[in-house]
Structure formats: structure tokens, C-alpha cells
Amino acid sequence: MIRDVLVGIVKGYRLLLSPWLGSSCRFEPTCSAYSLQALQTHGAAAGSYLTLTRLARCHPWCAGGSDPVPSEKPRFKSQLFTQLIHPSSEKKSS
């Protein structure tokens, strides 16, 4: 139920606000498409977490690029700061 409300909010944004604001997302897929995919794939909690970390990375100083929704659910106790600074595609494996 909560997931459906969040999906409705994102779809409302895409319908009402996005055409007025223009396309300024630096990532592929766009942040709103990413949000819809994350919510539908991982549910309300994990999808919201992924959406918020993605929005925090989408700024003028970010290189952007391809950043698909991960197939696995995120670990909430993992290194949040690192996830905000570096997209998952740019992380180096240890």
C-alpha cells in the first residue's frame, strides 16, 4: 500500500512537474525512472532508500552516467557516506 502511494507520487511528479522543470538528470535511467524501478523491485523501504541515495548523488558536480537499479536489496547499515559520494558503478572492489 505504501509502495503504491510512493509510486503515485513519482508518477505525479513525472506528469505534472517534470515537463515544467525540464530534463536535468545526469544519470541513465533518469532519477524518476530509477525511483519507479526501485520501488517496484524492492518495495517501499528499500526503494525509498535507493531513491534518496540516488537523488543525493544527482548534482551538478557529478559525472553521472549509467546507474541501474541494483538487483539485490541494499544493506542499510553499509557505508552510507560512500554510497552517497560514489555511484555503485564506480566503486572499486576490495
Swiss-Prot record:
This is Putative membrane protein insertion efficiency factor. GO terms for cellular component: plasma membrane. It holds the Pfam family YidD. It comes from Albidiferax ferrireducens (strain ATCC BAA-621 / DSM 15236 / T118). Belongs to the UPF0161 family. It is a peripheral membrane protein. The keyword Cell inner membrane applies. Keywords: Cell inner membrane, Cell membrane, Membrane. PANTHER family: MEMBRANE PROTEIN INSERTION EFFICIENCY FACTOR-RELATED. Could be involved in insertion of integral membrane proteins into the membrane. It is found in: Cell inner membrane. InterPro entries: Membr_insert_effic_factor_YidD.
